[in-house]
């Protein structure tokens, strides 16, 4: 189990700087299969794609992610359909990544590996 999965997401109100690329790569090693993307609007963000055998399995997974997000107070962007789910995580208030993004990714990894 990732040490990050044992931590709690901390609410961010924009009072911290986003991670730099060195910090991002350090934390990226602690989560499984997540990719980092950068865009001009949202800065760096984490993305992971999942495959499932049918629509219901995708929906069940997204519902579990939603429960974790609510419990952590940190909400990813979610897309899903027949046989797939896609998750995008970043901290909106700082337009980039912070430790809480990787904590949420690690918690999601736990349910995807269960």
Q: Language-model features: where?
A:
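Long, contiguous binding/interaction regions
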Residues: 1-56, 60-114
């Amino acid at each position: 189990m990732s040490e990050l999965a044992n931590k709690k997401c901390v609410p961010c109100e924009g009072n911290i700087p986003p991670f730099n690329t060195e910090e991002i790569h350090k934390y990226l090693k602690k989560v499984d299969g997540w990719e980092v993307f950068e865009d001009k609007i949202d800065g760096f963000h984490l993305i992971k794609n999942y495959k499932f055998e049918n629509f219901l399995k995708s929906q069940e997974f997204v519902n579990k992610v939603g429960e974790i997000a609510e419990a952590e107070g940190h909400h990813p962007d979610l897309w899903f359909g027949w046989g797939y789910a896609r998750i995008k995580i970043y901290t909106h208030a700082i337009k980039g990544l912070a430790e809480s993004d990787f904590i949420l990714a690690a918690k999601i990894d736990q349910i995807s590996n269960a």
